UniProtKB/Swiss-Prot annotation:
This is Coenzyme PQQ synthesis protein B. May be involved in the transport of PQQ or its precursor to the periplasm, in association with PQQ biosynthesis, but is not absolutely required for this synthesis. Keywords: PQQ biosynthesis, Transport. One of its GO terms (biological process) is pyrroloquinoline quinone biosynthetic process. The gene is pqqB. It holds the Pfam family Lactamase_B_2. It comes from Acinetobacter baylyi (strain ATCC 33305 / BD413 / ADP1).
Amino acid sequence: MLIKILGSAAGGGFPQWNCNCENCLGLKQGTIQAKARTQSSIAISDNGKDWILCNASPDIAQQIAHNPELQAPSSIRRGTSIGSIILTDSQIDHTTGLLNLREGCPHQVWATPEVHEDLSTGFPIFNMLKHWNGGLVHHPIDIQTSFQVAVCEAIRFTPVPILSNAPPYSPYRHRPLPGHNIALWIEDTRTGHSLFYAPGLGQMDDSILSYMQRADCLLVDGTLWKDQELALLGVGKNTGQDMGHLALQEERGLIHLLSQFPKQRKVLIHINNTNPILNEDSVERATLKQLEIEVSYDGMLIEV
């Protein structure tokens, strides 16, 4: 099973267009060692030819341009190697890219009923794209049931409800239902190898820990180093908890959590532009390296 990191940053990308925090300014001026990153999205394949897109970031057109395996085969005039799309939530940063994919409609989109409701009301992408050659075809995800997608039939997806938050535009903000945010336990049925994918983790519970324990690779939320990082840097008021993200450094943060999984490969994704781990020469980055926690980057290929 192949996992291609299309975008490794959180909302806004890195550098963020309107930000002069130490990281963003340092990257723009060339004073820090860091890689530019687009917004969070991955693609999964069981054969290297057909792909399932997990979340459609606002940067999806750029991501497809930089990853030829997702482009139309040269034998056809128009098309794509993306056969289906799975959404883990209804956040703007994970769904706006659907608008950029409208020329390729109809698209088969797997999402929970809660996500579909948000994307039919508060941010009505499903309605907006109806007139584009059939638009988005919704395949409901039942959070109690594993599912497979025909385009990569060897891969089985198990939705794992996670404690995070609904988007700011949603009427369920600060009171999300179980289907508003899911992680995915992704298994190659041919080999039994598996990936736990959770770009947004707000809190932990026994179910999440159980799936993480069973996985060979953990591709998880690396949004913030400190819970109050935005306020400390003077770029915002929201904490990690406000946004549904468990910070890395906190006493019961993600680093502490990942220490419980010595056998698994551990990779961070959805990294905010303020996070010091983006600076490859930082103390924080060195800490992760010592703990054998990787920082994903755009174009990274993971084989499980």
